Amino acid sequence: GEAPGKSYADPYFGGEGPERNSCIACGGCMVGCRYNAKNSLDKNYLYLAEKQGAQVFSETRVIDVVPLNGKADGEDGYEVTTVSSTSLLFRNKRRWRAKAVVFAGSSLGTQDLLFKLRDKKSLPNISAQLGRRVRTNAESLIGVRLPNVDNMDSGIAIGSGIYLDEKTHIEATRYPRGSDAMGLLVTAMIRGKTDWRRVFIWLYTLLRLLVRNPRQAIGSIIPFGLAKQTIILLCMQTLDGHIDMLYKRRWYWPFSKRMVSFGPKIPAHIPEASEFALKTARRLGGMAGSLITEVLFNIPATAHCMGGAGMGRSADDGVVDVQSRVFGYKNMLVC
């Protein structure tokens, strides 16, 4: 019953946080709330840290972390080197000294930095377990585009979900109006094969769709209007699957190393999810779609990447201990 967009005192931290507004159902929760209604990082952790005297340096990238005073284990602290993450001409290199450091650059960002620091011998004692057991939610990003609808972009970004079976969950989600760039990665959904035949099945599907329903066929490759016409279906499963990451040179770019995955592949095609999307499309008169990387290359996408710097009893089976302290170093955590 509250009025959309109305301001309220901080409801989360006993009044210590900033004012918030009630939701106006713009659908922008996942891409960034513009109306002060979401409990985002700048309104909780960072806001409260700054209130206690911490300084936040935005648009800054860490490129080196070296133990001070020749103490290899970091007992005396670390020198941290940073550059601007947005300037192409002026790097604005700066050096900082800290008694302790915390790596919190998400799964991929933290792994990438730790790989680089170990490789350049700044932190050579980082465990060989770095990059092991990187997990996703075994998910598939699919959807249904409805050409005769123009209001699918209004509402809460993630509004409902159902279980197809004991291991498969699907959420109905949305993007706000104008957030159509994702449409460049969307194409008509195909069934079945996960090998090289998928490309030909996809071409056949597009040609058949072009003959039977030219409007849907053209709509499947044009991103404009995607947000207002699409129910995005995020499928996740509770299956035990993971990949491992290495830091190496690729044959097509031998000039520098980068993270690459290896080991058993995570499935890109989830039959239960595809059938659900196709049935939904038939019921609503729309077209089921999936990401072109899944269709052409059998490469899944994920919104949830986790792990890579896992806990263990020692450096032989983990990167950090149960208190997130990095093995081999003092005053260093991964969070």
Q: How should each PLM-predicted stretch be described?
A:
Residues 1-59, 298:
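Conserved redox-cofactor binding core of oxidoreductases
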Residues 35-39, 43, 50-51, 60-74, ...:
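Glycine-rich loop(s) and the adjacent beta-strand/alpha-helix scaffold that form part
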Residues 2-4, 25-29, 63-66, 231-234, ...:
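A glycine-rich dinucleotide-binding beta-alpha-beta segment and adjacent secondary-structure elements
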Residues 2-14, 70-72, 79-81, 302-310:
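Charged, often glycine-rich, active-site loop that binds/positions anionic groups
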Residues 98, 127-256, 305, 317, ...:
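FAD cofactor-binding and catalytic pocket of flavoenzymes
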Residues 56-58, 103, 334-335:
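General beta-strand structural signal in soluble alpha/beta enzymes
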Residues 45-46, 131, 274, 278:
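Short amphipathic alpha-helical segments and helix-helix/interface helices
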Residues 19, 32-39, 103-104, 263-270:
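Hydrophobic alpha-helical scaffolding
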